[in-house]
A protein has these predicted regions:
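Active-site anion-handling motifs in enzyme catalytic cores
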Residues: 1-385
Length: 385
């Protein structure tokens, strides 16, 4: 029996959505292959790496000469002693980037991460899995041919939505290794800490700095929408709170919004991704511009309005049967009616039942994804514990 060494690519230590994916991976492996060891790039803060019990690797997205091969010169016993994995130590690469490969992100990221794994590391002896994520489009020069290399080498590629599937099938319609599977953080069910019991049943606004970018006009429109949501949802008499899902940019938006309101609203800002998910899971309703905030709500059958910056928000609302609760920022006339539909759904037992049924279907698809991943790993690494 041997221990499986697994490198996780694409998970940022500074992003709660990414850390939820890490938590979901660790939880699932603890049930099926409890001896597995995980590694992330050594650029992670040491305290975070220690907290999650992770080994370190040389970052795959560094440019220039691939220094990771120099690590092979260090004796394996010493590498293990200091918690480092060289490329030859790694049995499995799991890419959990979420949304990082397509024209929006450019060719360099795709080449340095996915293509490098496919062409420089992948052999018949190891396993390369792209976990569910949004992918494409691949229209810019070099993008299609680069991703085709990944399609040719990866053992399994899971795309998170139908639009991504179209982008991938546009390159290779008959690929046997591509699956349509949802975001897998829907299988996490963290407990709400006792100290936060009073937030149960709150209405949450979850902002996202990516909604505004560098465009002042867009920033003004987005803040106007958040003001509209705060006014309308606050009028219900329910506890209303701003939830900071990610770092300083979202925090600044919360401060800026509160400065515009006649009465500032409470800000919930928990460092733990699991506690953040638990708060969302006991909400009455949410208005979310954070993708994993939206998943946390919908998976817990919490009615939600989506106000997002990419196709992935509309896609997930369609998956959960709530496309009528998707906001188009440009269509200001639809803001209030959509928010009214949200509050009606939140009060309506049948709407919640339908959402719970859709959530169960999505969880089944995530279970199917993991079943296929573990069947693949057991087939390719029969000696692993």
């Amino acid at each position: 029996v041997s221990v499986l060494n697994i490198e996780i690519v694409g998970v940022s230590p500074h992003n709660k959505g990414a850390l939820l994916m890490l938590e979901a991976i660790r939880e699932r492996f603890s049930q099926h292959l409890p001896g597995a060891r995980f590694a992330v790039p050594f650029t992670w803060p040491t305290d975070k790496r220690m907290h999650y019990g992770l080994y370190s690797t040389y970052p795959r997205d560094r440019g220039g000469f691939d220094k990771s091969r120099l690590c092979e010169l260090v004796p394996r016993g010493f590498r293990q002693g200091v918690g480092f994995m060289a490329p030859s130590d790694i049995d499995v690469v799991l890419d959990a980037s979420g949304f990082a490969y397509g024209d929006y992100w450019g060719l360099q990221k795709l080449q340095r991460r996915l293509v490098a794994v496919a062409t420089n590391w992948k052999t018949d002896r190891n396993t390369f899995v792209v976990l569910p994520q949004a992918l494409g489009p691949f229209k810019e020069p070099g993008m299609a041919s680069a991703f085709e290399k990944v399609l040719g080498k990866a053992d399994l590629i899971c795309v998170r939505d139908k639009t991504s599937m179209q982008h991938v099938q546009g390159l290779a319609a008959d690929k046997h290794n591509v699956r349509l599977r949802p975001d897998f953080t829907n299988l996490l069910h963290p407990e709400l800490p006792e100290r936060l019991r009073e937030v149960q049943g709150a209405v949450l606004l979850i902002p996202n700095e990516k909604m505004v970018g560098q465009d002042q006009a867009r920033r003004n429109t987005y803040l106007a929408f958040l003001r509209c949501a705060a006014a309308q949802l606050g009028a219900t008499g329910r506890r209303l709170a701003l939830l900071v899902h990610e770092g300083d940019g979202d925090r600044r938006l919360a401060v800026e919004l509160n400065a515009m309101l006649p009465q500032p609203i409470e800000v919930l800002d928990e460092p733990s991704p699991l506690v953040t998910k638990a708060i969302i899971g006991v909400a009455h309703a949410t208005v979310s511009s954070r993708f994993h905030g939206l998943i946390s709500a919908l998976a817990a059958a919490v009615p939600s309005v989506a106000c997002g910056w990419t196709h992935k928000y509309q896609e997930v609302m369609a998956d959960y049967g709530c496309i009528h609760l998707n906001i188009d920022l440009a269509n200001q006339a639809a803001w209030q009616p959509t928010l009214q539909r949200l509050m009606a759904a939140a009060q309506h037992a049948e709407a919640r039942r339908q959402l719970a049924s859709a959530a169960a279907d999505q969880r089944s698809l995530s279970e199917a994804m993991w079943a296929e991943v573990f069947a693949l790993l057991r087939r390719r690494h029969p000696e692993a514990a």
